Amino acid sequence: MYEDEAWLNCHPDDLWIFDKLIVAKKLGYICGPVGVDVPKPGKYIVRPCVNIMGMGQGASFEYLTEDTDALTKHNVYTNNHVKLGYFWCEVFEGRHLSVDYKTNPNQRSLKQGLTVEGFRSKNNPLWKFDKWVRINEYVKFPKVLYALQGKYDCINCEFIGDKLIEVHLRPNHDIDDFNEAIPVWNDELIIPPENYIYVEDKDYNRIGFFKR
């Protein structure tokens, strides 16, 4: 299942999990939509509230000083704008983890499954990861998600440090049964390094993975 299917199959009362601003607000983060002033000047992460396309598209770090109105009265973008449909949030530091939680609604059980850590060079855009590595590490299921009304086979959560930043009602498909996945981006060679295989998997600016 992919994100568009997950949205279609989502219980109406659970659709808030697709809106990252609502997720952030429920978790008590410092955040707000376009048009709401930031509490103090500083670096914030700016993202679309809803991004069904995934891959961190549209996300960036921005220095915001006060108001975040998207347009001036002359309909001209300012240097301090946040686009309509976007939101700003405080920046978190730490490891980027993606965790699948397998659920059995009939038995009301929950089990942690695939857990991977993402690595991204500091100067890369937020969508451009260097690799994903399977890890064996316990990550507690977020308390806020126990209130979900629908029945889902898998709930995927992404964390920065211990902060939940995204929720998906489908599994992580990138690494499959492998232990490591290196994204191969547009215009890069598809000749795999030693002990890796190339797997075509096209998405935003990506043509596949080297996996092992």
Language-model features: locations:
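ATP-dependent carboxylate activation and anion-phosphoryl transfer catalytic cores
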Residues: 55, 92, 107-109, 120-212
